[in-house]
C-alpha cells in the first residue's frame, strides 16, 4: 500500500496550465504505480488549460467548484460542458481538451491518466 497525504503530495508543472496548482497523488514522484497516475488540480478563478491534444486517455472528476470542459475531436466541432462536484468526463487519446474555471471560486479536479499511450491497433 502506498499512502500520499495531501500535505505531502508533490507539486508538478504541466505545460500550458495557467493559474493552477497541480499535485501528484499517486504514481511518478508520489510513489509506485504500474499503469496510471492520479493528480489533483486546484484551479483559481479564471484559471485554465490550453485546448491541446494528448496521446493519453484522461479521466477527470470534479471534486469542488465548477469547471467548463471542452473537447474537440479532429474533424468535428468542439463540445463544451459544465461539470459540478462528482461529475466526470473522459477524453479519448488524441482528443483536444481544455478546462476553464469561469466561476469566482476555486475548483478542484481529480485526474487519472495512464503512463503510456494505447498500443497501436
Q: What is each model feature region?
A:
Residues 74-93:
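Short acidic-glycine-tyrosine-enriched beta hairpin
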Residues 28, 48-54, 71-72, 80-81, ...:
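Short histidine-centered beta-strand/loop micro-motifs
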Residues 1-35, 120-121:
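A short, N-terminal "cap"/entry segment at the start of jelly-roll beta-barrel domains
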Residues 84-85, 93-118:
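Ligand-binding loop in jelly-roll beta-barrel domains
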Residues 24-26, 39-54, 93:
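Conserved short histidine dyad/triad with adjacent acidic residue
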Residues 47-50, 68, 88-89, 93-99:
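Histidine-centered metal-chelating micro-motifs
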Residues 40-44, 54-69, 112:
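Short, conserved beta-strand element in jelly-roll/cupin
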